[in-house]
Structure formats: structure tokens, C-alpha cells
Amino acid sequence: IVLFIQFGFAQKSSYSPYSYFGVGETNFSATADNKMMGGNTAYVDSVSVNLNVPASLSKLKFVNYSVGVNLKNNRYSTQDNNAKTTTASLNYLSVSIPTKRLGFNFGLKPNTSVGYLLESVDETTDPVSTNRYNGDGGINSAFLGIGFELFKNFGLGISSSYSFGNLNHYHSKILTDVELYTRVSSESSLSGLSYNFSAVFQQKFRNNIKIYSSYVYQPESSLTSKNSQSIRTLKLDGSFGGDTENINLSLTGMDETKFTIPSFSSFGLGFGLDKKWFVGLNFKSVQGNGYRNEFMSLDNVNFNQHNIYSVGGFYLPKFDSFTNFFDRVTYRAGFKY
């Protein structure tokens, strides 16, 4: 587990100017098969687990080991410049185990990531000055979930996550032809607990068609942020220039602050034929006023309530075919907005 946590800290999964805000760029946390269906949460079977729906563990019949790697390509453009970035990172690591009365799982997944480099040049000053903003870090979580069947076709689940990580933001002011420059470092170490509650329901109708439904609710939680800030003189090659001043944040009460993670609820609904096909939709609502930290607050930035819609499904020609490989392949498609 120590190796997993170290890897979680070491990876860099974002190169985005938007990761400057809040706790960074939010990771689309879902297994590969769920992602391919747009993030649908309704479908549950006996061999796979939905990491966002701990109630799916109530249907698990076989031990499940899951590892996911995320490859992301982004393109950013302004009136003057275009940029492309490619990042690869661990997306999830999970072990799920069924027992006679319930199923449980544990694992590690990254929640957010920070990675940006922004520069603005002021040629009206003498000497010309450059303001450089860069950052790194992110938040990961170690989770433990259980799911059990309360009634026939109806399962409940709960998961607990311990979130941890570091957010580092740096502001450098560089003057042309001046050997030294100053850099302000603002660093935060965050940790805290969150909980996730869910329910799943399945019912078989005519011609063995099944209706699948799910509900997920995660209440608002907070992370404790222990902060530090310093001003350092550096040489142009990045080496230490000789002066460092540590700012006493306790004088302003900024040495320890709270970071709010907003609540969300999600509802999924779909229908299909077991081991053959499935079509479903999902609705997720994330409350506003979250992702705010007094230590790194911005007056002109707000985090508002937003909704996410997704539709997806799969088709499996013949799951027990021994003669044709492509008949055993599951074809998935989906999108989210």
C-alpha cells in the first residue's frame, strides 16, 4: 500500500491552466467500462464493480482486481496561441471481494490534479518584467466500501474515503538582465474524510428484459488544509540565491484553513437483456459554493451548481462463443455533457 500511495503522489496527470483554481482539475473517476458508457451508474452485474456506487458490491459474485490508466489529450487555444498537452496517469486501483452476506472493496484513486505554467510579459516597464505562475500537486483518496442486499433485487452500499495530498502554487517575478529574481511559494497539505451512500435496484420484466436503477448521494465534506508561505531569492538557473523569508501565517489565521468539497447526487436508469445489451442514462447534480479555500481564494472566481448528463450502453453478440473472438467482445459507447 505504501508503494501505491507514493505512486499516487508522484504522478502528474494534468497540464491545464484551469487546474490553477480550487483543488485542481477534477478527475473523471470511473472504471474503463463505465467510462465507455459515459459514466453510467445504473448497470450492475456479478463480475464487475462500479467504484462510484458501493451498492454494486451487493451483486458481486467473483473476486475483482481492477487497475486503470488514463491517457488524456487536451488542446487549448486563444486568439494568439495554441497548445496541446498529453498526460498519462493512474486512474484507479481496486480490489473487490464478495462474501456470503456482503461484498467489500478497497483501493486508491486520484481525485484532482494540479499542473500549469502561465506567463505574462510587461514590456512597458524598464527593465521588462515577466510574471510566471506555475503549480503542481493534487488530491488522492484511499477508499473502503461495502455493499449488501437488503431485499431481493435491492442493494445498499456505503464507502468511506480518506483524502490526502499537496497543492503547490508558485509566483515568480523576473526582470530582464537582472541576475536574481523572487519567488513566492504557497503550499498546502490537505487531508480529510468523506462518505458515499448508494442504492441499486433491478427488476426483470417480459422476455427477460431487466430494468436497472441506481441512486448515489455524497454529503458535503471538508478537508483540513495546513498552509505555509515563503519568499525566496533565486538565480536565473533556478538555484538558491541566498535569501529566504518564511511568512508567519498564524498572525492572520491562514496557517490552517478548511477546504469545502460540495455534495452531489446522482441517479441512473436503464434497461437491457442480461449478458446481451444495455442502454441507460444518468443525471448528476453537483452543488455550488465548494472548492473554496480562504488561503488561495480569488475574488472574481465562483464555483456554481452544475449538472452532468450522460447516455451509454453496450452490446455483446454472444458471450459464450467458442468459435468467434469478436462475438465475445463487448462493444460499448456513450457520451456525457
Identify the residue ranges that each predicted region occupies.
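Bacterial N-terminal signal peptides
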Residues: 1-6
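Subset of outer-membrane beta-barrel
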Residues: 11-337
